[in-house]
């Protein structure tokens, strides 16, 4: 039973990284389209840090940001994907890494960014997993050491991507929103409540986050099971 469960988790993980396993698929092309739209969304300056969030759990934010990290890396950019969801982290599962040392260790000065970052089997893509789940995620993410971490990441990487908790669940995403160059809101087609999505947008803007657009996922299409659309706010 345990082996079967592990196999199911592995299969779900491989499906979630379609840009790696099947880069020529229609869905992978949609991710590349999102990447292009992100890059052209701000004409006067490059976007160095991007946060991806959702209004509620299970809307696909972690799958979205993992695949965006892959397509940015495939473009030749040195990418760091940071798991800032310190409550329900998933990056270490997706990329099959241990999670003994990560964000929380760096923020509490128990490790350096250089020693905590892990290389993946995708060229140019590195991850900083969450590390041990702390009792005070919001305080850590809003600390001065978070600003130091981001500044150091800018020195070492071309693009820094943050996976964060859902906006309506906790304040973590709002805390990070104004530290990032841009934010993407993921919406689950047919599931996300419109009022919830609107409330999430309002909270991000109130936190002085720069909302770049919305990704609509799980939209049924004739050609494929999933469709990702990037639109402005």
How would you name each of these model-derived features?
Residues 1-233:
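P-loop NTP-binding module
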